[in-house]
Amino acid sequence: MKVIFMGTPEFAVPALKKLITHHEVKAVFAQQPKAKGRGLNLAKSPIHQLAFEHQIPVYTPSTLRNDKTINLINKINADIIVVIAYGFIVPKAILEAKKYGCLNIHPSDLPRHRGAAPLQRTIIEGDRKSSVCIMRMDAGLDTGDILMKEDFDLEERTTLEELHNKCANLGAELLIKTLANIDNIVPIKQSSDGVTYAHKLTKEEGKINWYESAYKIDCKIRGMNPWPGAYFSYNDKIIKILEAEYLNAEHHFTSGTVISDKLEIACGSGILRVKKLQQESKKALNIEEFLRGTNILKDTILK
C-alpha cells in the first residue's frame, strides 16, 4: 500500500519502521527542526531523521491549513495517510484526500483519555488497564471509528517510559495488521459513555499536594516524569521527585511532614518514601547522594 506518514516524536518511530518494511512510504510530514543544546543547532525530529536515512521525501510545513499543503498532499500518489503524534490539526480536506482516509494510533482505551496526553493521564489516574486503538480519523478530537484495538493490563507501578514503549511497539504491530485487512474490517463507533479528556500537562500540575494520598502522589511522580515533573519547594528551590514508593501505613503527622532522616514524607493517607530527586539546574541524584548535599531535617513540613 502507498502511504503518506505524518508524525514527529520517538513514539511514532516503530510504526514508520514497520511501514517502511511492509509498505511503500511515499512521503513523510514532520514538524520543523528545532534548536537544541547550548549551541542552539537545528535538530531534526526522530521521524524526520528516520525518513532522511531512508531517502523518503520529508516535508515540514508550519501548518496543514493552507491550499499549498493540501494541494501537495493531493498530488502525492498514496492510498492512505497515517498520522501519529504529528502535533498539528489535520483539516477535513486532508482527512478525505485519500481512498482509505487517515488512520491514527491512539494509546488509550477510547473514549477514555481522548486528547493530547493519554499516556501521562493513564499513569496519573492510576489506570490498571489500557488499550491501543487504530482509529479512522474524523473532524472531532479522537472521536473516529475504531478499526482495531488491543487491551492490556498495567503493572501497579508502571512508568511512563514503560507505557510509552509498549504502546508505540504494540501500535506499530496493530497498524500493519489493520492495513493488511482494511477492506474486511467493520469499523466500530466509539461509545458515548465513559468519555474523558487527557488534557495537555501544565507545569503547575506538577506541584505536589501533600494532602493527597501517597499512592496518588506516586502516580503523579511516574506520570509526570520527565515533564513537567512532580515537585515541591524547599528553601525557595524547586525539587523534583523522580522516583519514590508509597507505603500504606497509618500515621498521626501533618501532611507534608518529613518523618525520618531518609526523606519519608507523611501524606493525606500513607507515607511517601523518596528514592531519587533533582534540584532545579542540577543533576538527578539518588536519595543518599541528595541528602549529603541538601539536609532536609526530620520534622520539616514541606510545601
UniProtKB/Swiss-Prot annotation:
GO molecular function: methionyl-tRNA formyltransferase activity
Superkingdom field: Bacteria
Residues that coordinate or bind (6S)-5,6,7,8-tetrahydrofolate: S108, D109, L110, P111
GO cellular component annotations of the record: cytosol
EC number(s) recorded for this UniProt protein: 2.1.2.9
Catalysed reaction, written as an equation: L-methionyl-tRNA(fMet) + (6R)-10-formyltetrahydrofolate = N-formyl-L-methionyl-tRNA(fMet) + (6S)-5,6,7,8-tetrahydrofolate + H(+)
Keywords, ordered alphabetically: Protein biosynthesis, Transferase
Residues that span the membrane, as ranges: none
InterPro entries in the cross-refs: Fmt (IPR005794), Formyl_trans_C (IPR005793), Formyl_transf_N (IPR002376), Formyl_transf_N_sf (IPR036477), Formyl_transferase-like_C_sf (IPR011034), Met-tRNA-FMT_C (IPR044135), Met-tRNA-FMT_N (IPR041711)
Protein family according to the UniProt entry: Belongs to the Fmt family.
Reported function: Attaches a formyl group to the free amino group of methionyl-tRNA(fMet). The formyl group appears to play a dual role in the initiator identity of N-formylmethionyl-tRNA by promoting its recognition by IF2 and preventing the misappropriation of this tRNA by the elongation apparatus.
Name the UniProt record assigns to this protein: Methionyl-tRNA formyltransferase
